Design a protein with these regions (language model features):
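Outer-membrane pore/translocation modules
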Residues: 18-181, 191, 198-199
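Short amphipathic alpha-helical segments
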Residues: 2-3, 98-100, 207-212
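Generic hydrophobic/packing signal
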Residues: 11, 89-91, 181-183, 205-207
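Cleavable N-terminal export/targeting peptides
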Residues: 1-22
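Outer-membrane beta-barrel "beta-signal"
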Residues: 72, 148, 184, 202-212
Length: 212
C-alpha cells in the first residue's frame, strides 16, 4: 500500500510541478503573465525544496508605471494524498517603481506580498492567490483571484495535458472590481501555456511557464 502511495505521489509531483512557483532544486524557471491590468516577466532559481528567488519586471498598463523587484517565494506547506496534492505559498517582492510612457513620476520604492494556495487531482483544480502592493504615488492596491477547473481527459506523463478553467478576479480599486475570465491551460514537458479572455472588460489573458 505504501509503495502504491509513494508511486502515486511521485507521479502527481512530476505532472503538476510545471505550474509551481517553486521548482526542483537547482532548476531555473521563466514565467510570463499578462492580464487585464499588467504584464510581467519573472526569472527565478530554486536553491532549496521550499524556496525560489528571482527577479521580476511588471508593467502596469493602466497607470503607466513599471516595477523592478527581487521576488522570493516560500513553500509553506505541501499536502500529498493518494490522488491529490495541495500547496500553500507566501510570495513577495521589494524594488523600484518607475514611470513609463511619458508619465512624469519619479522613482519610488515598491513592496508587495501575498499568498497562493492550490489543490488538485489529475482531473480537478482549485486555486486562490492574493497580493497587496504599495508603490508610493503610483499605486496602493489589493487583488485576489479564485480559479477552478477540470481536465477533459487524463493524460500520462509526457502527454499533452489540457485544462478548462474559470478565474474570478477581484480588484477593489478598479471600476470593474469583479471580473470573469474563462481560459484553457495546456502543458507538456517543461512548458505550460494559458490563454483566456476577460468577459467583463474585454481583455485577453496569456501566461506561460518554462522550466529548465
Amino acid at each position: 500500500m505504501w509503495k502504491a502511495l509513494l508511486i502515486a505521489a511521485a507521479y502527481l509531483a512530476s505532472t503538476m510541478a510545471i505550474g509551481r512557483p517553486v521548482s526542483y532544486v537547482g532548476g531555473w524557471t521563466v514565467i510570463g503573465e499578462s492580464d487585464r491590468q499588467s504584464s510581467s516577466a519573472l526569472v527565478h532559481y530554486t536553491p532549496s525544496p521550499n524556496m525560489s528567488l528571482g527577479f521580476r519586471t511588471e508593467v502596469n498598463r493602466d497607470s503607466d508605471f513599471a516595477i523592478y523587484s527581487v521576488h522570493p517565494t516560500l513553500l509553506a506547506k505541501r499536502w500529498f494524498g493518494a490522488d491529490y496534492q495541495g500547496n500553500l505559498y507566501f510570495h513577495g517582492g521589494i524594488g523600484v517603481a518607475s514611470s513609463i510612457h511619458k508619465n512624469p513620476g519619479s522613482d519610488q520604492m515598491a513592496i508587495y506580498g501575498g499568498v497562493m494556495a492550490d489543490w488538485e487531482t489529475r482531473s480537478l483544480f482549485v486555486g486562490y492567490r492574493n497580493r497587496y502592493l504599495e508603490a508610493g504615488d503610483y499605486a496602493s492596491q489589493f487583488m485576489q483571484a479564485f480559479r477552478a477547473g477540470f481536465a477533459p481527459y487524463e493524460g500520462d506523463s509526457g502527454d499533452l495535458h489540457t485544462w478548462l478553467m474559470l478565474e474570478i478576479d477581484h480588484r477593489p480599486s478598479d471600476p470593474d472590481s469583479v471580473t470573469a475570465t474563462p481560459l484553457v491551460r495546456f502543458f507538456k514537458g517543461p512548458l505550460l501555456v494559458e490563454a483566456g479572455y476577460n468577459l467583463t472588460v474585454n481583455q485577453p489573458l496569456f501566461n506561460f511557464t518554462y522550466r529548465f
